[in-house]
């Protein structure tokens, strides 16, 4: 028998054996999920917003869950009757012998201990955000012996984690799903002793003792950082159309996970947006849906989407691209049933059938914790390097003896990586490159 440290020592001494162990664990988990072993059961009507939120939290934290529609699945309806649970108490989450009635995402996160207990601890590097940039920083920092903590507001992977197939990422000739990339990256980071915490959001940055930075978290805990990486990414903008608020989580979504395609089987869906994420969602949904309409405000996809995705969309008989068009209204009872589209060229309005609308338009940086501390550009993205050096006003570079490093913000030792920084490439490879680069600069700062 090996304890945690013994197993880690063995894997370090025999890395080839370690690769087999990790691959075996991944394969074992995939088999268990396919067979339904250890899979949590989420019982709720199809249009339940709370069930959608819980499922999204679990799936994106790589925890196996299946949604059973109580209105169409007789076994789940019978289980509710047997447990004497009324429909008004749905969603119901069944995990082993535990049954949670109408739980919020926060209650599920607490029950499954997604948040790490780190109150008052000191770290060489604290990373805010666990998208590709944050995970890359965690892997490289941990592998180089830096004590690293990663706080992720929702779940690892970021926007890339919801991609069904990333085909232009180096080393994966047949493509890689965002879920697979996230799963392997989180395992890799933990292998190097990085502490990862989900559903854990930084709410404030402040001066700490001994020249460290204090990071206050949303559950009352705090950590101290010698260096900090802002890898908080960006969030999709909301669709401005009648009915959006009513159907959010009940027909209006910001990601197309693998389970969404299955739920869209033989149905009509709409994807709003012209970037790569929208293209990946459209091609994925087209494998199951009866029809997919891609709605874009611009005149063509070629200026905003990678060529390979444009080509695939044009070749799909199930995908229709509607340029210079916007969604003006959504209608339905408990879920979306139809969508009103407006042609911006001639003002013609048409109603089309749709059971789901996937919105992937624009993005706003997630910088709330750094408000009033770090300088931003006109769009709200963090200024780094020469941008930080040129920043004026009260948020400016304070050191006269050196310029900020390439990814360093106006605060020495605080870096930005990935989509949250000004001038980012908005590609997975670029974010991973940022994550690796900040570790190099962090070493220089720590060396003093």
Describe each PLM feature range.
Residues 39-45, 267-271:
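Short hydrophobic beta-strand segments
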Residues 1-21:
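Cyclic-nucleotide recognition modules
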Residues 119-156, 240, 248, 254-307, ...:
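Rossmann-like dinucleotide/flavin-binding elements
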Residues 42, 46-73, 83, 127-194, ...:
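Beta1-alpha1 glycine-rich phosphate/pyrophosphate-binding loop at the start
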Residues 182-218, 222-225, 230-232, 286-401, ...:
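A Rossmann-like FAD-binding core segment of flavoenzymes
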Residues 20-28:
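Intrinsically disordered or compositionally simple regulatory linkers and C-terminal tails
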Residues 33-39:
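Short, low-complexity disordered segments enriched in Ser/Pro/Gly and basic
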Residues 72, 76-128, 144, 161-162, ...:
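FAD-binding core/adjacent interface of flavoenzyme oxidoreductases
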């Amino acid at each position: 028998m090996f304890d945690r440290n013994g197993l880690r020592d063995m894997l370090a001494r025999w890395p080839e054996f370690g690769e087999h162990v990790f691959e075996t664990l991944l394969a074992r988990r995939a088999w268990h999920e396919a067979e339904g072993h250890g899979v949590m059961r989420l019982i709720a009507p199809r249009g339940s917003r709370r069930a959608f939120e819980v499922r999204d939290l679990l799936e994106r934290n790589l925890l196996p869950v299946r949604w059973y529609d109580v209105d169409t699945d007789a076994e789940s309806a019978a289980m509710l009757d047997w447990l004497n649970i009324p429909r008004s108490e749905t969603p119901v989450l069944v995990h082993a012998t535990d049954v949670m009635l109408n739980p919020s995402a926060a209650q599920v996160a607490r029950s499954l201990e997604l948040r790490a207990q780190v109150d008052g601890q000191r770290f060489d590097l604290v990373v805010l955000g666990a998208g590709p940039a944050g995970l890359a920083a965690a892997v490289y920092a941990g592998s180089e012996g830096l004590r690293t903590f990663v706080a992720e507001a929702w779940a690892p992977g970021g926007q890339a984690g919801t991609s069904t197939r990333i085909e232009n990422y180096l080393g994966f000739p047949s493509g890689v799903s965002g879920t697979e990339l996230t799963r392997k990256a989180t395992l890799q980071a933990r292998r190097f002793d990085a502490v990862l915490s989900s559903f854990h959001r930084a709410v404030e940055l402040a001066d700490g003792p001994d020249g460290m930075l204090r990071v206050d978290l949303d559950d009352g805990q705090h950590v101290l950082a010698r260096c900090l990486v802002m890898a908080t990414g960006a969030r999709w903008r909301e669709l401005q159309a009648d009915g959006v608020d009513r159907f959010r989580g009940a027909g209006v979504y910001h990601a197309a996970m693998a389970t969404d395609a299955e739920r869209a089987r033989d149905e009509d869906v709409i994807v709003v947006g012209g970037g790569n994420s929208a293209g990946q969602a459209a091609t994925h949904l087209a494998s199951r849906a009866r029809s997919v309409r891609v709605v874009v405000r611009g005149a063509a996809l070629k200026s905003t989407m990678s060529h390979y995705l444009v080509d695939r969309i044009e070749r799909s008989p199930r995908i229709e691209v509607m340029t210079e068009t916007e969604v003006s209204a959504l209608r339905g009872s408990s879920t979306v049933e139809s969508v009103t589209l407006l042609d911006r060229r001639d003002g013609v309005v048409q109603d089309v059938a749709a059971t789901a609308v996937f919105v992937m338009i624009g993005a706003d940086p997630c910088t709330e914790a750094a408000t009033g501390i770090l300088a931003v550009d006109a769009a709200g993205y963090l200024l780094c390097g020469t941008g930080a050096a040129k920043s004026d006003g009260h948020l400016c570079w304070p050191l006269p003896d050196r310029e900020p490093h390439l990814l360093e913000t106006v605060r020495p030792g605080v870096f930005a990586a990935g989509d949250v920084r000004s001038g980012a490439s908005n590609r997975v490879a670029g974010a991973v490159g940022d994550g690796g680069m900040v570790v190099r600069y962090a070493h220089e700062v720590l060396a003093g």
